Design a protein with these regions (language model features):
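Sparse, context-dependent recognition of short Cys/His-centered cofactor- or disulfide-binding micro-motifs
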Residues: 14, 30, 53, 68, ...
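A recognition module on extended beta-rich or small alphabeta surfaces enriched in W/G with H and D/E
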Residues: 75-127
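Hydrophobic/aromatic-rich core segments of domains that either
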Residues: 45-92
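Cysteine-nucleophile amide-bond enzymes
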Residues: 34-35, 62, 66, 119-122, ...
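Mid-length scaffold segments of soluble, non-membrane domains
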Residues: 17-52, 56-62
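Secondary-structure boundary elements
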Residues: 1-18
Length: 127
């Protein structure tokens, strides 16, 4: 549903350019993570917790990348599963967090605070 809503027709980085120039409505990695998190939370799963994470948050060269992670209720993010529909242009990639072959994930709040983007942390805490 999100791939249709985002009008995905290209690989992720090309789609990002189109979102950033206004020719596509949404579809940046953080859009996918935010919308996926909202949909999963709306399901009200009592046995799962949602986490948000960012990779490459310290890199000046690589783009940072956001995702949603699910874990057993009460478990740490690192024990969860990465749910990343951005990576393959709308096809869901999933992997245990610690086995992700491409990204090393950190809790979103930690990365945002460290990088001085506190307003995003506060907005996430309110919503």
């Amino acid at each position: 549903e999100l791939a249709i809503a985002y009008q995905i027709t290209d690989p992720p980085l090309i789609h990002n350019v189109k979102v950033n120039n206004g020719s596509k409505p949404r579809g940046l990695c953080w859009h996918w993570a935010e919308d996926l998190e909202k949909r999963l939370l709306a399901e009200g799963f009592a046995t799962l917790d949602m986490h948000r994470a960012i990779a490459n948050g310290n890199s000046r060269i690589l783009l940072d990348h956001s995702t949603a992670i699910i874990s057993a209720a009460g478990a740490q993010m690192e024990a969860g599963l990465v749910l990343d529909p951005w990576r393959q242009g709308g096809e869901l990639f999933w992997s245990p967090v610690m086995s992700d072959p491409r990204y090393d994930w950190e809790p979103r709040e930690e990365v945002l605070r460290r990088n001085g983007r506190v307003r995003y942390v506060q907005a996430g805490m309110e919503g």
